[in-house]
Amino acid sequence: MNNPNQPVSYPIFTVRWLAIHAIGIPAVFFIGSITAMQFIQR
């Protein structure tokens, strides 16, 4: 896991994981809020 020969793989993986989590959590919250509003309106 600690390979100095591939310093490019570590930052890319970190950025990708961070982006997925940063986008996934608010997306789930947004979708849940929309569904809740639709159910309340109905």
UniProtKB/Swiss-Prot annotation:
Main location per the UniProt record: plastid
Binding site for heme: H21
CC cofactor note: With its partner (PsbE) binds heme. PSII binds additional chlorophylls, carotenoids and specific lipids.
Topology of the protein relative to the lipid bilayer: Single-pass membrane protein
GO biological process: photosynthetic electron transport chain
Record localization: Plastid, Cyanelle thylakoid membrane
Subunit structure: Heterodimer of an alpha subunit and a beta subunit. PSII is composed of 1 copy each of membrane proteins PsbA, PsbB, PsbC, PsbD, PsbE, PsbF, PsbH, PsbI, PsbJ, PsbK, PsbL, PsbM, PsbT, PsbX, PsbY, PsbZ, Psb30/Ycf12, at least 3 peripheral proteins of the oxygen-evolving complex and a large number of cofactors. It forms dimeric complexes.
Protein name, UniProt field: Cytochrome b559 subunit beta
